[in-house]
Amino acid sequence: MLKLKMMLCVMMLPLVVVGCTSKQSVSQCVKPPPPPAWIMQPPPDWQTPLNGIISPSERG
């Protein structure tokens, strides 16, 4: 059993050493494209046209 543990330790040691010394690859941050122009415009005024179509009913 001791021989098996020793063999596992000897086999794992190079993997640990290589893992600690190797540089991890980091992907560069990609800058997102600017938003389309229509997103930057103010929202349309829908209430004014609807007020002409929909009006409160008159009380009789």
Swiss-Prot record:
GO biological process per UniProt: membrane fusion; negative regulation of proteolysis; viral release from host cell; viral release via disruption of host outer membrane
Keywords recorded for this protein, A-Z: Cytolysis, Disulfide bond, Host cell lysis by virus, Host cell outer membrane, Host membrane, Lipoprotein, Membrane, Palmitate, Signal, Viral release from host cell
Stretches assigned to the Periplasmic side: 20-60
Transmembrane segments: none
Protein name in the entry: Spanin, outer lipoprotein subunit
N-palmitoyl cysteine lipid sites: 20
Start and end residues of each stretch annotated as Proline-rich: 32-44
Signal peptide: 1-19
Lipidation (S-diacylglycerol cysteine): 20
Assembly and binders: Homodimer; disulfide-linked. Interacts (via C-terminus) with the spanin inner membrane subunit (via C-terminus). Part of the spanin complex which spans the entire periplasmic space. The spanin complex is composed of one homodimer of the i-spanin linked by intermolecular disulfide bonds involving two Cys residues and one homodimer of the o-spanin covalently linked by an intermolecular disulfide bond involving one Cys.
Annotated organism of origin: Escherichia phage lambda (Bacteriophage lambda)
